[in-house]
Swiss-Prot record:
This is GDSL esterase/lipase At3g43550. InterPro entries: GDSL, GDSL_lipolytic_enzyme, Lipase_GDSL_AS, SGNH_hydro_sf, SGNH_plant_lipase-like. Glycans are attached at residue 25. Its EC number is 3.1.1.-. It comes from Arabidopsis thaliana. It is found in: Secreted. Residues 1-19 form the signal peptide. The active site is at 37 (nucleophile). It is an enzyme of class 3 (hydrolase). Belongs to the 'GDSL' lipolytic enzyme family. Keywords: Glycoprotein, Hydrolase, Lipid degradation, Lipid metabolism, Secreted, Signal. The lineage of its organism: Eukaryota, Viridiplantae, Streptophyta, Embryophyta, Tracheophyta. One of its GO terms (molecular function) is lipase activity.
C-alpha cells in the first residue's frame, strides 16, 4: 500500500504539472518514457543483467498475478500516467519481442532499471543507458513511419508527452566510483548538465512536449536509512539528499532556460518536495 500511495503521488504530480503548462484539453496521442526502474515495464527481461524482476514475488498484484519485469508488485508510474492520460492501462516495454506494430501507437517505455545519466551507471549494471534509449527511440520512429506513415510519426513527435526519469542510481551508487573525479556538488552538477543535454538531443529528434522528473529524496530509501541512518533512528542519508537537491537546483533553471530557447514545451516536474514531505509526515497523507 505504501508503494501504491507513492506511485500515485508521482503520477498526479507529473500529470498536473503537464496540464498546468499545456492545458487540460490537449489531445495526447502517446506517452514516450525514458529512464530507470521507476518507469521500466520489462526492458531488462532479456538483458545479461541481475537487475530484472520477471519472477515471483514481483507482479503478485499485477492483472493476472504474474511477473512482467516491472520493479513492483503491480503497475508502475509509466502505466498509471498512461492510464491517467487516457491512453492505455499498461505501457509496453519497447524491448518486448512480442510487440506488434499497433502496440506502438499509444506509446512505449524505453526505461531500463538500474540506468542513469552517467554512462558509467549503465555499464556497471549491464543495462540500457539513457543514451542508448535514444537510439531505440529513433528505431521506434522509423517503425511508426514504415507501418503508419510520415504524418502519424509527425503527430506522435509533435503532440505526445515525453517523460524523462533518472538520476537515483547515479547518485546512490555510481558516485562512489566517481568520487576520485568529482566532489558531491560537481557530480550532481554533471548529472544535471547531462540531463539537459539529453533533453536537447531528444528535441533534435523531434520531441516537442518534454517533462523531466527531479531527483527524488534517494537518501531516504530503506537501504540508505539502514546503512547510513543510525542504528536506532534510521534517519535519511542527508549528504545523499543534499546531492539530490543540488541536482534539482541546477536542473530546474536550466530547463526553464531551455523551454524559452527551444520551440515546444519543456517542463521540470518537482517530485522531491512532495515525496520528502510524505516520508517526514506520513500521517498527513492518511493511514498507509
Amino acid at each position: 500500500m505504501k508503494l501504491q500511495i507513492i506511485w500515485l503521488a508521482l503520477v498526479l504530480i507529473a500529470v498536473e504539472t503537464y496540464a498546468v503548462k499545456q492545458g487540460k484539453n490537449v489531445t495526447i496521442p502517446a506517452l514516450i518514457v525514458f529512464g530507470d526502474s521507476i518507469m521500466d515495464t520489462g526492458n531488462n527481461n532479456n538483458l545479461p543483467t541481475l537487475l530484472k524482476c520477471n519472477f515471483p514475488p514481483y507482479g503478485k498484484d499485477y492483472p493476472g498475478g504474474f511477473a512482467t519485469g516491472r520493479f513492483s508488485d503491480g503497475r508502475v508510474p509509466s502505466d498509471l500516467i498512461a492510464e491517467k492520460l487516457g491512453l492505455v492501462k499498461t505501457l509496453p516495454a519497447y524491448m518486448n519481442p512480442y510487440l506488434k506494430p499497433h502496440d506502438l501507437l499509444k506509446g512505449v517505455t524505453f526505461a531500463s532499471g538500474g540506468t542513469g545519466y552517467d554512462p558509467l551507471t549503465a555499464k556497471i549494471m549491464s543495462v540500457i543507458s539513457v543514451w542508448d534509449q535514444l537510439i531505440y527511440f529513433k528505431e521506434y520512429i522509423s517503425k511508426i513511419k514504415r507501418h503508419f506513415g510520415e504524418e502519424k510519426a509527425k503527430d506522435i513527435l509533435e503532440h505526445s508527452f515525453f517523460l524523462v526519469v533518472s538520476s537515483s542510481n547515479d547518485l546512490a551508487h555510481t558516485y562512489l566510483a566517481q568520487a576520485h573525479r568529482y566532489d558531491r556538488t560537481s557530480y550532481a552538477n554533471f548529472l544535471a548538465d547531462s540531463a539537459v543535454h539529453f533533453v536537447r538531443e531528444l528535441h533534435k529528434l523531434g520531441a516537442r512536449k518534454i517533462g523531466v522528473f527531479s531527483a527524488v529524496p534517494v537518501g531516504c530509501v530503506p537501504l540508505q536509512r539502514t546503512v547510513f541512518g543510525g542504528f536506532f533512528t534510521r534517519g535519511c542519508n542527508q549528504p545523499l539528499n543534499n546531492m539530490a537537491k543540488q541536482f534539482n537546483a541546477r536542473l530546474s533553471p536550466a530547463l526553464d532556460s531551455l523551454d524559452k530557447e527551444l520551440d515546444g514545451v519543456i517542463i521540470y516536474i518537482n517530485v522531491y518536495d512532495t515525496l520528502f514531505d510524505m516520508i517526514q509526515h506520513p500521517k498527513k497523507y492518511g493511514r498507509f
